[in-house]
């Protein structure tokens, strides 16, 4: 007899007392639902598996990479480069799924918590990949170059392109200018303490200043976080007018706030995605290092790859927000990601340096310092009046193009 027949018999029999019959039916339905034996449960499970096929694909990809690692090395640099590119693409796609579920959580809690969840998930990916690569690499400048690249990508790349495209479509786009000012001064302070002052610290005192930097970054971020979610939360939000909809037509004003699945499910998939990224990143870094060894590739290419992987989900989210005329979300994402990268990555990596006894070179080069100052000055001017436009976006995007040019020049 089938499951449906068994259920029908157990619930419709007249032999048992009514109270016992109701209780047994309730227990039966609960068990069948928890085991996914109902049509609704099967449909939901199938839908989740279909949506998260990229996460599932990462598991056999990691197994294949593990089993073929030595064969790829023996095949030469070209094979290693192809394997690294494939893994980078897969890591980016998984990062986008992580960002997707971060957006689901963000839609449930609203700003500023929403964009904070998104940027923290991106920073978690970046720190994890950095830690894995640093365990296999002897480059003392990788952390510095990655943070510098992330700031260039976030402010000049993401903010610049979003303001440019949004300005071309909507003209002037409003946002809360308090957020731009707050982010700007925090980024300047954090980068000054952690990436400019170290140039003047005696080598024998690096561990003392490293410990101070950790405390300073944590103190800055703790107060910033308290203000962002507390008394000054209005700094990071903007009240956009609701669009009117014709009678009889459903409102799609919150189409972007996807309500797919539960909060625990999204949290679980974010954690699973970050773990899978870490596993794939270990193989990716090995293959990429092997393929670039002895070539004329720019020294900072690995750092740019790490920064791009962590920023890739934010790029799509920011562009969608700009084209919807939601510039506040763009500012929170671009500037918030830059701040989070500096203020959270630095203490973690400095802590690793103190633990291992091997210092990193955190002081920026003169070219990097000049680019950061030009970027932050331009951001301070452009984000000072509560509206962005295409010209302001173009200035940042040209700075991003300059960053790419300097990368290929080895600067």
Task: Locate predicted features.
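Hydrophobic alpha-helical segments, chiefly the membrane-spanning helices
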Residues: 34-411
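Intrinsically disordered, charged low-complexity linkers and terminal tails
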Residues: 13-14, 30
């Amino acid at each position: 007899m089938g499951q449906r027949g068994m259920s029908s018999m157990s619930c419709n029999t007249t032999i048992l007392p009514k109270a016992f019959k109701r209780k047994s039916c309730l227990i039966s339905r609960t068990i069948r639902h928890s085991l996914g034996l109902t049509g609704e449960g099967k449909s939901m499970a199938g839908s989740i598996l279909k949506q998260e096929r990229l996460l599932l694909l990462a598991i056999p990809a990691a197994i294949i990479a593990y089993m073929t690692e030595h064969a790829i090395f023996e095949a030469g640099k070209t094979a290693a480069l192809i394997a690294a590119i494939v893994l980078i693409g897969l890591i980016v796609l998984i990062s986008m799924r992580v960002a997707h579920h971060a957006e689901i959580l963000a839609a449930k809690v609203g700003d500023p918590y929403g964009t904070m969840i998104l940027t923290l998930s991106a920073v978690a990916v970046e720190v994890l990949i950095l830690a894995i690569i640093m365990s296999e690499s002897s480059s003392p400048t990788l952390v510095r170059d990655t943070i510098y690249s992330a700031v260039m990508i976030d402010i000049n790349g993401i903010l610049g392109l979003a303001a440019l495209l949004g300005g071309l479509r909507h003209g002037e786009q409003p946002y809360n200018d308090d957020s731009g000012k707050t982010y700007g001064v925090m980024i300047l302070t954090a980068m000054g303490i952690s990436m400019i002052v170290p140039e003047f610290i005696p080598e024998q005192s690096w561990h003392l200043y490293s410990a101070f930097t950790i405390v300073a970054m944590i103190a800055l971020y703790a107060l910033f976080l308290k203000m962002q979610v507390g008394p000054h939360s209005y700094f990071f939000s903007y009240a956009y007018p609701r669009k009117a909809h014709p009678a009889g037509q459903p409102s799609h004003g919150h189409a972007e706030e996807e309500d797919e699945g539960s909060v625990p499910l999204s949290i679980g998939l974010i954690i699973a995605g970050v773990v899978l990224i870490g596993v794939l990143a270990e193989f990716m870094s090995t293959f990429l290092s092997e393929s670039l060894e002895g070539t004329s590739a720019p020294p900072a290419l690995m750092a740019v790859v790490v920064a791009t992987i962590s920023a890739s989900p934010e790029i799509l989210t920011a562009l969608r927000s700009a084209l919807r005329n939601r510039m506040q979300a763009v500012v929170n994402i671009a500037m918030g990601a830059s701040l989070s990268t500096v203020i959270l990555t630095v203490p973690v990596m400095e802590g690793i340096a103190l633990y291992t006894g091997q210092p990193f070179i955190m002081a920026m080069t003169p070219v990097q310092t000049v680019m950061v100052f030009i970027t932050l000055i331009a951001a301070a001017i452009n984000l000072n009046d509560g509206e962005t436009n295409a010209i302001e976006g173009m200035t940042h995007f040209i700075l991003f193009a300059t960053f790419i040019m300097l990368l290929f020049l080895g600067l």
